[in-house]
Amino acid sequence: MSTRRAFLWAVVAAVAFGGTMATFPAVAQSGPERLGLKGYDPVAYFTLAAPTPGITEFEVVHDGVRYRFANARHRDMFRANPDKYAPQFGGSCAMNMANGIRREADPTIWLIANGSLYVFAGSAGQERFRLEAQAQAQRAAANWKTLKDMSSQ
């Protein structure tokens, strides 16, 4: 590939992904009991169809992640079936994960597909994922196996 062509591809990539990539750190917050979904209630995406802030009074730690809930009912629903409500890929951007990149997501940009919660770094990624949700989810799941233990920098 010529230097000019490589440069043009770099410019295209920067324009297409630059805003999304510049907004969020490379990896979601890590460490003991990191706060999942930046404090949003994971059950509310399913029951209220909206990102809803949780409160510290209703917290649960699951797989080293601390989740907050808007009310006791949501907390109890999560405790009964955490795998149903927890975001896929540890709350990392699902579209980036499908592309082999672990990137923190914005929990206000989300999608429920095939009964699972996916969050995204930007609305363009959300739309690309939605168009081929099953295939993108499979690619992301395959990449998650190797990227899930990637540490924060």
Predicted regions and their residues:
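Cleavable N-terminal signal peptides
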Residues: 14-16, 26
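Charged, low-complexity intrinsically disordered segments
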Residues: 2, 21-153
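N-terminal secretory signal peptides and thylakoid transit peptides that target proteins
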Residues: 1-14
